Amino acid sequence: MGLKRKKISVIGSGFTGATTALMVAQKELGDVVLVDIPDMEDPTKGKALDMAEAAPVQGFDAKITGTSNYADTEGSDLVIITAGIARKPGMSRDDLVNTNANIMKSVTKEIVHYSPNTTIVVLTNPVDAMTYTVFKESGLPKERVIGQSGILDTARFRTFVAEELNLSVKDVTGFVLGGHGDDMVPLIRYSYAGGIPLEKLIPQERLDAIVQRTRTGGGEIVNLLGNGSAYYAPAASLTVMAEAILKDQRRVLPTIAYLEGEYGYQDIYLGVPTILGGEGIEEIIELDLTKEEKAQLDKSADSVKNVLNVLQ
């Protein structure tokens, strides 16, 4: 039995899906199948062909194909879901809930039919509730259904800190926990620049401003674009997760995980520090939180529960 390349299916060929497909192919993480609805099949094939023709120029070996037929996803090692309607200016994430939940259900049925042993990463907003929906619909073990938000939120936080200190983003580390909304919890105590705690480098009022900008980071881009939402940084975040899983890297990354008692929460998907590897979420890291941090996380968890309650 010869070795085969890994297979990655990306569901949704919009800006985020297409950018993710290209990024995972450029890293040679596996062959990529880009999937969209039948009405979008030709544009999806066109995008895939365009990317495939970049391969000889950039020197990466990965097949990229476009389709609307889920049979083409059969045997996927990893499936990334970006499908769904996007948030428009003035629209709350909650407005998206039921439309996108129905999309998640139909997509998940197809995925697990053709790839019963896959791992699924969800990006579609509101992501905590959509990941929960996919988990319940899929029947997969909890560690193999994972949501993306913490890497993106942490990346935004690190960007703003690096700007503030005029330092390399590589030297800034941090953790943003909780839901992917205005109640997310950037943990300043666990955030460093070159190993030095941020509280020693940045005055409190500037830190507070950075935290606030991080919380509204997605909305800031939505408003600037005027049509659509962020996709480069979200795609980069998905690619980091894909690499950690497909290469069994056991990276410490904030992801949206199913909690059964961790941090005191039950039956909820919430952003927490995890070890991400070949089995998906291999471990949930429970940090010691102050009363204030725990109260913030409680508020964030309540926001996620409120969205779940909107689900019909």
Swiss-Prot record:
Sequence positions bearing Phosphoserine: 149
Pfam families, sorted: Ldh_1_C, Ldh_1_N
Reactions listed under catalytic activity: (S)-malate + NAD(+) = oxaloacetate + NADH + H(+)
Chain sites annotated for binding NAD(+): 12-17, 36, 100, 123-125
GO BP term, pick one: lactate metabolic process
Gene Ontology MF term list: L-lactate dehydrogenase activity; L-malate dehydrogenase (NAD+) activity
Keywords of the record: NAD, Oxidoreductase, Phosphoprotein, Tricarboxylic acid cycle
Key word Phosphoprotein present: yes
Catalytic residues of the enzyme: 180 (proton acceptor)
Top-level EC class: oxidoreductase
InterPro entries attached to this UniProt entry: L-lactate/malate_DH, Lactate/malate_DH_C, Lactate/malate_DH_N, Lactate_DH/Glyco_Ohase_4_C, Malate_DH_type3, NAD(P)-bd_dom_sf
Positions with a binding annotation for substrate: 87, 93, 125, 156
This protein's record includes keyword Phosphoprotein: yes
Enzyme nomenclature, EC number: 1.1.1.37
Family of this protein: Belongs to the LDH/MDH superfamily. MDH type 3 family.
Function: Catalyzes the reversible oxidation of malate to oxaloacetate.
Protein name: Malate dehydrogenase
Gene: mdh
